[in-house]
């Protein structure tokens, strides 16, 4: 599995960092800006990119719609790779190669990429200004965006994605109306990800919202704390659904437990499938596990299609994540353990407190402004 290969590569890299720690400190290079130093001169170019996007893309380092969409871009660009197609003599996509921007006139017309044309338009000027590759920028912006969310792990960034040469084929990005079997088959083909690692990837929905799933309403979060990288998503997806936040009958959605909150059909199914339910539940009130697993799987995702041994580790450019500023997981006001649809057969659902007060609607997240 690609997952196992990455683990081995990271283990070797960590060993080398430990054994060579003192020499590396002496070999740091001074960056041209006169402010920063780096372990590799190639990383210096990314400090100005960081300053620029933190101020002008993420509005001073906020965990808002732009951060959510930057993370979405990483998934939709990276997962578009198929060794299965390659084995049939067809082009299977380049993975994390920036093709969703390079060939945006093609790939943003694919159904699962609806709405990403606006994100592409927002990100393109930054790429042109700094002269970096599209694939590297997507991965970098995604890592920085996540780091702006309290509770996020220390994100990693590896440099060295060449420009895409072809548009990725259609049909490689999972959709919310797909079955569990369809999603798992796609994830296994793309990166050797199994059902457990797929759950790790879905942790991204802790800081996500839907802008285009329901065309009648945008900015619908998938949990009640979209500005925090926490485990609340894994609590609320196990609550019994009671109503749709907007229009009923939207393909790929099911009833959610809270007003203003959207629940994707795939999230609902993963929380209840016997292959994934226990891993899903394991994140509840386990911030350390959430951070460690997402840090790892983001790196695996954002390097799909590339040899990590040929890439440069520039993780030092990614800022330290904002610290946890929230308490343990909880039941939203008006909800209790009785509202949980228990699916993990081997482990009881954790004991949680219920938030005080009357039940309230989850606030919408304003979408990113349209580019000029």
Curated annotation (Swiss-Prot):
Cofactor(s) the record lists: heme b; Ca(2+)
Reaction it catalyzes: 1-(3,4-dimethoxyphenyl)-2-(2-methoxyphenoxy)propane-1,3-diol + H2O2 = 3,4-dimethoxybenzaldehyde + guaiacol + glycolaldehyde + H2O; 2 (3,4-dimethoxyphenyl)methanol + H2O2 = 2 (3,4-dimethoxyphenyl)methanol radical + 2 H2O
Propeptide: 22-28
Metal-binding is among the record's keywords: yes
Site (Transition state stabilizer): 72
Pathway of action: Secondary metabolite metabolism; lignin degradation
Residues binding heme b, per UniProt: 205
Cofactor, how bound (note): Binds 1 heme b (iron(II)-protoporphyrin IX) group per subunit.
Positions annotated to bind Ca(2+) 2: 206, 223, 225, 228, 230
Keyword tRNA-binding included in the entry's annotation: no
Disulfide partners: 31-44, 43-314, 63-149, 278-344
Residues reported in the UniProt entry to bind Ca(2+) 1: 77, 95, 97, 99
GO BP annotations, alphabetical order: cellular response to oxidative stress; hydrogen peroxide catabolic process; lignin catabolic process; response to reactive oxygen species
Variation of activity with pH: Optimum pH is 2.3.
PROSITE patterns: PEROXIDASE_1, PEROXIDASE_2, PEROXIDASE_4
Gene3D superfamilies named in the record: 1.10.520.10, Peroxidase, domain 2 (1.10.420.10)
Residues at the active site: 76 (proton acceptor)
Keywords: Calcium, Cleavage on pair of basic residues, Disulfide bond, Glycoprotein, Heme, Hydrogen peroxide, Iron, Lignin degradation, Metal-binding, Oxidoreductase, Peroxidase, Signal, Zymogen
One Pfam short name: Peroxidase_ext
Entry EC no(s): 1.11.1.14
InterPro entries attached to this UniProt entry: Ccp1-like, Haem_peroxidase, Haem_peroxidase_sf, Ligninase, Ligninase_C, Peroxidases_AS, Peroxidases_heam-ligand_BS
First and last residue of the signal peptide: 1-21
Free-text function comment from the UniProt entry: Depolymerization of lignin. Catalyzes the C(alpha)-C(beta) cleavage of the propyl side chains of lignin.
Homology family: Belongs to the peroxidase family. Ligninase subfamily.
Name of this chain's protein: Ligninase H2
Organism: Phanerodontia chrysosporium (White-rot fungus)
């Amino acid at each position: 599995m690609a997952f196992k290969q990455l683990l081995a590569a990271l283990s070797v890299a960590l060993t080398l960092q430990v054994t060579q720690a003192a020499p590396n400190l002496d070999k740091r290079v001074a960056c041209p800006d006169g402010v920063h130093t780096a372990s590799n001169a190639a990383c210096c170019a990314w400090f100005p990119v960081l300053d620029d996007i933190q101020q002008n893309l993420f509005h001073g380092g906020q965990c808002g719609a732009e951060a959510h969409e930057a993370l979405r871009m990483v998934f939709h660009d990276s997962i578009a790779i198929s060794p299965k197609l390659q084995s049939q003599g067809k082009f299977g996509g380049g993975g994390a190669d920036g093709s969703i921007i390079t060939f945006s006139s093609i790939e943003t017309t694919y159904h699962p990429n609806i709405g990403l044309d606006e994100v592409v338009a927002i990100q393109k000027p930054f790429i042109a200004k700094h002269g970096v590759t599209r694939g590297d920028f997507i991965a970098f912006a995604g890592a920085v965006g996540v780091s702006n969310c309290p509770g996020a792990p220390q994100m990693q960034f590896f440099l060295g994605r060449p420009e895409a040469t072809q548009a990725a084929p259609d049909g490689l990005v999972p959709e919310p109306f797909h079955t569990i079997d369809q999603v798992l088959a796609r994830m296994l083909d793309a990166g050797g990800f199994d059902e457990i690692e797929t759950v790790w990837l879905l942790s991204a929905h802790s800081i996500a919202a839907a802008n285009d799933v329901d065309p009648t309403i945008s900015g619908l979060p998938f949990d009640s704390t979209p500005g925090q990288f926490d485990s609340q998503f894994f609590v609320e997806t196990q609550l019994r659904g009671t109503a749709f936040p907007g229009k009923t009958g939207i393909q790929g959605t099911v009833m959610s437990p809270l007003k203003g909150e959207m629940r994707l059909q795939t999230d609902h199914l993963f929380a209840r499938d016997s292959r994934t339910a226990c891993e899903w539940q394991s994140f509840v009130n386990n911030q350390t596990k959430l951070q460690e697993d997402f840090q790892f799987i983001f790196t695996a995702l954002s390097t799909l299609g590339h040899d990590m041994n040929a890439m440069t580790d520039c993780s030092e450019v990614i800022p330290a994540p904002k610290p946890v500023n929230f308490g343990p997981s909880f039941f939203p006001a008006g909800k209790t353990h009785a509202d949980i649809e228990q699916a993990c057969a081997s482990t009881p659902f954790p004991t949680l407190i219920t938030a005080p007060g009357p039940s309230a609607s989850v606030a919408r997240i304003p979408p990113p402004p349209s580019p000029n």
